[in-house]
């Protein structure tokens, strides 16, 4: 009986479950594609900021808007320095001693309870229950970095976002950074929602239908809620309003798409019946000791009439993606590679060389499953790199990322 109770206690803790990156909020795409992609977009600006603070003997103050369970803390402290070598193990830009304060704000008390349970052991981390639009920035010491990741500001009206960014610009010191992530207007996931009348179609009815049901439990009734979807011109209009209100205190550093063809609703086909479960398949690429059918990773892009520029971006990325996957498959099989595309962008050619090197090394390995644990994860990283280097910041990914700097 004691043994049974001991194992039951372990099961209830949730720590006795088989780990997997194939499903859930923290799946492989979230950790190895999305978190790292956001970090790579932010990295050059973050490195400059940290270098300035270090020269002055100062530490970083971070404010996470809509922090949820505190994921932003792990995200920001895990960004790797661009100058680190393969021999190093302490490679984070923000070393433990560089963080003065991480403060998270969220309106959801349940998520804040979870955040406190996770980070309670850290003395320089705290969480506040509040609507971040109502938070008095003037009552606090200025922050150096403001996070609003994973669609946080898609909960805001444009007027609220302009007011928030205006307050941040006025209250912050020179060099402060802001990273925002809206839902992209022209993500392939919601092809049925594409419109040219952006003034009257700012919102989508979003539903979290992609998380698996708990074993043995009836799936809960799903709740739809409004989220702002954002294209490039709309984001630039918001930026211009903030510049006008602040006298130019805010500079746009980067506007970029993320998670093209791997957003969560690719697997549900909730808003586009033509979607393939590409997120599940890319999760499989990153999963150790799991081999993936690469034929299924090929994108079958279905254009929508009337959206020439959007279709051109998606089709170009799909063609390059498919060529990289097909060539990798030919390398693994030792078969003839496909004919070159009419256009072979430099990023594609460079990534093909990378995969040739990876497969060559894997072919000589006699330990472990070289395909599943070396070739496929590297293919996943190369597909991510392909997206990053071909994207145009048009709102064609699941997220549209904006990075701003305060200039005084």
PLM region descriptions:
Residues 5-54:
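Class I SAM-dependent methyltransferase Rossmann-like catalytic core
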Residues 162-174:
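A short glycine-rich, Lys/Arg-flanked "PGG" loop and its adjoining helix->strand segment in the class I
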Residues 59-68, 178-207:
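Conserved class I S-adenosyl-L-methionine
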Residues 70-134:
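Class I SAM-dependent methyltransferase SAM/SAH-binding core
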Residues 138-146:
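A short acidic, Gly/Pro-enriched loop at the edge of an enzyme's catalytic core
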Residues 224-246:
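Short alpha-helix
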Residues 262-408:
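C-terminal lobe and adjacent flexible extensions of AdoMet/dcAdoMet transferase-like proteins
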């Amino acid at each position: 009986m004691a043994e049974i109770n001991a194992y039951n206690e372990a099961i209830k803790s949730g720590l006795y479950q088989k780990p997997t990156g194939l499903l859930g909020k923290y799946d492989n795409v979230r950790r190895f594609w999305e978190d790292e992609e956001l970090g790579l977009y932010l990295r050059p600006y973050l490195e400059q900021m940290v270098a300035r603070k270090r020269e002055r003997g100062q530490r970083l103050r971070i404010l996470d808007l809509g922090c949820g369970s505190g994921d932003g803390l792990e995200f920001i402290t895990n960004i790797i320095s661009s100058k680190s070598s393969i021999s190093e193990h302490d490679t984070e830009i923000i070393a433990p001693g560089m963080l003065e304060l991480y403060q998270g704000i969220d309106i959801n008390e349940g998520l804040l309870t979870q955040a406190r349970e996770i980070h309670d052991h850290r003395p320089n981390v705290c969480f506040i229950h509040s609507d971040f639009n109502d938070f008095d920035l003037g009552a606090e010491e200025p922050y150096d970095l403001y996070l609003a990741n994973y669609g946080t500001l898609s909960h805001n009206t444009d007027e609220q976002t302009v007011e928030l960014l205006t307050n941040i610009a006025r209250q912050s010191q020179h060099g402060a950074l802001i990273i925002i992530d809206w839902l992209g207007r022209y993500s392939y996931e919601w092809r049925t929602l594409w419109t040219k009348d952006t003034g009257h179609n700012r919102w989508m009815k979003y539903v979290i239908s992609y998380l698996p049901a708990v074993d043995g439990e009836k799936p809960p009734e799903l709740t739809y809620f409004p989220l702002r979807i954002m294209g490039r011109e709309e984001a630039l209009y918001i930026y211009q309003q903030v510049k006008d209100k602040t006298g130019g205190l805010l500079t746009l550093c980067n506007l970029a798409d993320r998670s093209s063809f791997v957003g969560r609703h690719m697997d549900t086909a909730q808003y586009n019946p033509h979607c393939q479960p590409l997120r599940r398949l890319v999760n499989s690429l990153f999963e150790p000791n799991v081999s993936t059918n690469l034929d299924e990773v090929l994108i079958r892009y279905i254009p929508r009439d009337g959206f020439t520029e959007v279709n051109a971006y998606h089709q170009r990325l799909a063609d390059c993606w498919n060529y990289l996957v097909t060539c990798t498959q030919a390398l693994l099989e030792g078969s003839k590679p496909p004919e070159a595309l009419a256009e072979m962008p430099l990023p594609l050619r460079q990534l093909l060389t990378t995969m040739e090197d990876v497969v060559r090394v894997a072919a000589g390995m006699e330990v472990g499953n070289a395909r599943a644990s070396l070739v496929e994860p590297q293919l996943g990283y190369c597909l991510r790199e392909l997206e990053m280097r071909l994207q145009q910041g048009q709102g064609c990914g699941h997220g549209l990322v904006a990075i701003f700097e305060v200039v005084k």
